[in-house]
């Protein structure tokens, strides 16, 4: 028998489930370019779509790893047998995904690359992917014992208003180095896309679009138009009546 819960408790439970699932997959699939998760609930089963840049690593050899993840999720969250399915979906544009770029920068710093060089490489890749603007902030013990923050900005970036919710993609990651923990924050401003593939369909509120005027076709030959409208082809037209001729003048004596 299904337990009835209020709408408020249902929203809270769904939020906790997605947050815990995201945390688990972030730790488990960090090296495979994990970029987010989508949960779709149907009447018969729950579908979990894992977004990643390297989907082959997520699936594993002959689908072994995805089956292991399915079993762990099913056991942890108490799903009935066969009621949960995990799928792996490749990120269409890796350069426009903030999570993927934050993970990329994290592994560059772990590999010993200089902070400035790593950040400029990520910045350039994001802008070449077609974004409108981006911002990368790295904070912590970058040089010496004094903690500081370095910000790298390119293009246009909005910081306030409702468009931030659907135009700006943000990701925060932490990397543990020998000198301490560094914080990484990546913000990517997407471009307006009417098709909705690489950006939001809704344009910015201050966007002004100028419609090009249509080319006017000028007549090359003079055209005569009837004033009263088109004549009826069934009714024959009467020839115009001539005014009566004036009588010749009478000579006077």
Curated annotation (Swiss-Prot):
Subcellular location(s) of the protein: Cytoplasm; Nucleus; Nucleus, Nucleolus; Mitochondrion inner membrane
List the molecular function annotations (GO) for this entry. Answer: class I DNA-(apurinic or apyrimidinic site) endonuclease activity; DNA binding; RNA binding; structural constituent of ribosome
In short, the EC number is 4.2.99.18
The reactions it catalyses are: 2'-deoxyribonucleotide-(2'-deoxyribose 5'-phosphate)-2'-deoxyribonucleotide-DNA = a 3'-end 2'-deoxyribonucleotide-(2,3-dehydro-2,3-deoxyribose 5'-phosphate)-DNA + a 5'-end 5'-phospho-2'-deoxyribonucleoside-DNA + H(+)
Where does the chain cross the membrane?
A: none
Give the record's GO biological process terms: apoptotic process; cell division; DNA repair; positive regulation of apoptotic signaling pathway; regulation of translation; translation
Q: Where is this region: Disordered?
A: 211-253
Which EC class is the enzyme in? lyase
Q: Keywords, A to Z?
A: Apoptosis, Cell cycle, Cell division, Cytoplasm, Cytoskeleton, DNA damage, DNA repair, DNA-binding, Lyase, Membrane, Mitochondrion, Mitochondrion inner membrane, Mitosis, Nucleus, Ribonucleoprotein, Ribosomal protein, RNA-binding, Transcription, Transcription regulation, Translation regulation
Ranges where the KH type-2 domain occurs: 21-92
What the entry lists under Gene3D superfamilies is as follows: 3.30.300.20, Ribosomal protein S3, C-terminal domain
Chief location: cytoplasm
Q: Name one GO cellular component term.
A: spindle
Superkingdom to which the source organism belongs: Eukaryota
Q: Which PANTHER family match?
A: 30S/40S RIBOSOMAL PROTEIN S3, SMALL RIBOSOMAL SUBUNIT PROTEIN US3
The UniProt family comment states: Belongs to the universal ribosomal protein uS3 family.
Q: What does this protein do?
A: Component of the small ribosomal subunit. The ribosome is a large ribonucleoprotein complex responsible for the synthesis of proteins in the cell. Has endonuclease activity and plays a role in repair of damaged DNA. Also involved in other processes including regulation of transcription, translation of its cognate mRNA, spindle formation and chromosome movement during mitosis, and apoptosis.
Quote the protein name from its UniProt record. Small ribosomal subunit protein uS3
The species this protein belongs to is: Ambystoma mexicanum (Axolotl)
- Its encoding gene is what? RPS3
């Amino acid at each position: 028998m299904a337990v009835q819960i209020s709408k408020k408790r249902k929203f809270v439970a769904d939020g906790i489930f997605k947050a815990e699932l995201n945390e688990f997959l972030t730790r488990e699939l960090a090296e495979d370019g994990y970029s987010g998760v989508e949960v779709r609930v149907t009447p018969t089963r729950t579908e979990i779509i894992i977004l990643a840049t390297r989907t082959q690593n997520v699936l594993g050899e002959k689908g072994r790893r995805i089956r292991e993840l399915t079993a762990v999720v099913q056991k942890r969250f108490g799903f009935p047998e066969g009621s949960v399915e995990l799928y792996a979906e490749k990120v269409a544009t890796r350069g426009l995904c903030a999570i993927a770029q934050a993970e990329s920068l994290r592994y560059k710093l772990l590999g010993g690359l200089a902070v400035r060089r790593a950040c400029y490489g990520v910045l350039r890749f994001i802008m070449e992917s077609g974004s409108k603007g981006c911002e990368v902030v790295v904070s912590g013990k970058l040089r010496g014992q004094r903690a500081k923050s370095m910000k790298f900005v390119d293009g246009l970036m909005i910081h306030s208003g409702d468009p931030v919710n659907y135009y700006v993609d943000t990701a925060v990651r932490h990397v543990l180095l020998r000198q301490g923990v560094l914080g990484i924050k990546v913000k990517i401003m997407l471009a307006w896309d009417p098709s909705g593939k690489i950006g939001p369909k809704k344009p910015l509120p201050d966007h002004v679009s100028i419609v090009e005027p249509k080319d006017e076709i000028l007549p090359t030959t003079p055209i005569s138009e009837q004033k009263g409208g088109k004549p009826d082809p069934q009714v024959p037209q009467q020839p115009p009546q001539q005014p009566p001729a004036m009588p010749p003048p009478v000579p006077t004596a």
